[in-house]
From Swiss-Prot:
One of its GO terms (biological process) is protein ubiquitination. Residues 256-266 have a biased composition (Polar residues). It comes from Mus musculus. Residues 225-241 have a biased composition (Basic and acidic residues). Keywords: Metal-binding, Phosphoprotein, Ubl conjugation, Ubl conjugation pathway, Zinc, Zinc-finger. This is F-box only protein 30. It comes from the Eukaryota. The lineage of its organism: Eukaryota, Metazoa, Chordata, Craniata, Vertebrata. The gene is Fbxo30. Auto-ubiquitinated. May be neddylated. Neddylation may be required for E3 ligase activity, since it was observed only after purification with o-phenanthroline.
Amino acid sequence: MEEEVQQHSHCMNCVSRRCMTRPEPGVSCDLIGCPLVCGAVFHSCKADEHRLLCPFERVACLNRNFGCPFTLARNKVAEHLEMCPASVVCCTMEWNRWPVSYSDRKSYESLSRDVDEVAQLDMALALQDQRMLLESLKVATMMSKATDKISEPREQISVKSSVQEIPRTNGLVSVDEESYGALYQATVETTRSLAAALDILNSATRDIGMLNTSLHATANEMDEENNKESFQDKNLKDQDHLDEGEIGAVGGVDYSGTSQNAQAEQNGSSDLLCDLNPSSNGTSALCNGFPLEKMCIQVKGQDQNFHGDSTESNITNGDCVEADGTSEPSSSLVVPEQLREISPFSALPDSTFQQILMPDEDDEKDLCWKKVDLGDLKDVNGSPFSHAPSFKFLSNSWYIPKEDKAVDTSDLEVAEDPMGLQGIDLITAALLFCLGDSPGGRGISDSRMTDVYHVDFGTQTFSLPSAILATNTMVGEIASASACDHANPQLSNPSPFQTLGLDLVLECVARYQPKQRSMFTFVCGQLFRRKEFSSHFKNVHGDIHAGLNGWMEQRCPLAYYGCTYSQRRFCPSTQGAKIIHDRHLRSFGVQPCVSTVLEEPSRNCVLGLRSDHLSSLPFEVLQHIAGFLDGFSLCQLACVSRLMRDVCGSLLQSRGMVILQWGKKKYPEGNSSWQIKEKVWRFSTAFCSVNDWKFADILSMADHLKNCSYNVIEKREEAIPLPCMCVTRELTKEGRSLRSVLKPVL
């Protein structure tokens, strides 16, 4: 046995089909032919090597690791890949839609009224895109409770200060002057804290020596005042939770937690480090009602004297100047060098995080590393704060009396609900929330900065359903009956999913072209066998999608006023067949015409019209019949009965496709890896290829306009003079020419 397996010295280099060398032990062996009759002749010791090259040798498919169960001859592998069930292609075609404007909202509500009764391709695709958008769109909580808030775990490194604790008197108490440059915050308790901070700044500019002695009492008074205000604000928030009516935003800036902020001055420059810590009751800061993550903001001064014309001080970080001029070490927060060298806010990319030492929320003595998103520091309006501002122009502004107000829409002096947005449905509210954070969209409220010191806060000018504001679930769950009970009664009837909030017209923008952020982008994302992908892309995206704007589906010209009539101008080459859209499969399909000759026997049947003759056929016959159907039809047939489901299931390997579902497996050591959880077999949604399109045998749109209820003819019998003809008779009496009469009189 070993002699047959081992390579002989002669056989290693012999490639002749007519080798005449006699077999000798250890030197050569006999010539044999391929057992699969591929025509190859070789020495018997090379049989295993030939099996690696034989074209007739049966091997597993190249996609066996992706779920293909077939084994076939090696020369059939390339041909099999075109129809391999594991050779799946994902369609990445994209299209875009604009949200419905406020002026067109009424007309789109009338268009969505009879969507279940009348099958319209453009409306079906638009509603499908809207359902996909709402299923993936998560509405942020506007009224978050402390019990519902789940704080994200973060690693904290406790750092004890070895220096004796001294009150923070190294400079001025920092004020959050730039946080609203990226995100506006609306709370009630912030205005009083800001006033207290401004008083400290005012007193510091007048007499820097008196600041050290008076800051102890001021900090204690601020703590007592903040505790009192937070208790009152908590009662107000509890009352707001009970009220499920209309909700409006209140302008303001959250400066809570200013006692925990730190500032260091060195060589006349100031470094402000602001921390948006949560309030005392455990809830996070609110931005126009939305919860915000903690972020840190730094302002660097470049050799600027913060105190105007006063003498330049030599206060260093961590030093405190006493009344006699001596300095003592302080336990104030040390700003790391990596934070001081931050690039300008305009150059920061999105989602740029950095670990920064900041005081702990529970104990100010401890320092912990907090993860800060530096991308949040960018201004939404495109004009970010300078990271090295000059405070010379603020030298006299501290002496000007200032007043902070929390305003609402009562002083706008406009009619109540001027745009007719009272009681908007959940779909409109969800899209409005999604566009509110977009600079290109129409925000619910906005803030504008005139300079570093003056900020104009936007306020919410209309009410929104409480179901949107008081929940933190997906929009699809919000639109359920349980969520609608908390909202206005009219929101549940009609169903919010039937009200179209997206434009019917598709906008095709290439990936490399910039898009408006208020435009929604949709991806096909359907899976097909490799041989089905070309026909899907040509028929669905090239023919149907391109013809929905008036060629494939032609709407009445008066659709803007509410007419829902439409007609199919094009049909497949087979006369009578039509394009349909299945809401459950989320795909288009071709419905062939049924000949009247085939319908007559069923009418004359004794058993009635509902008799099922197809199920009485043998299983093999049903398999043969189902083999002629496309994937879209097989998906429909599998939903008819258990028998038809078994028939379609027997065709999965030859007509279906296999998809891998991955799952994350965790090991006892703590690490994890992704492994194949299961292999799912199903049919694709591809329909038979349509090579030619023809005009359907239908009436003209002009015939519909004759009977259209919206085509109301308004006859103008009374003459209406032009502006220049108001004094025609008087001018003509004077004998002036007609040309001078027609000229406008100025």
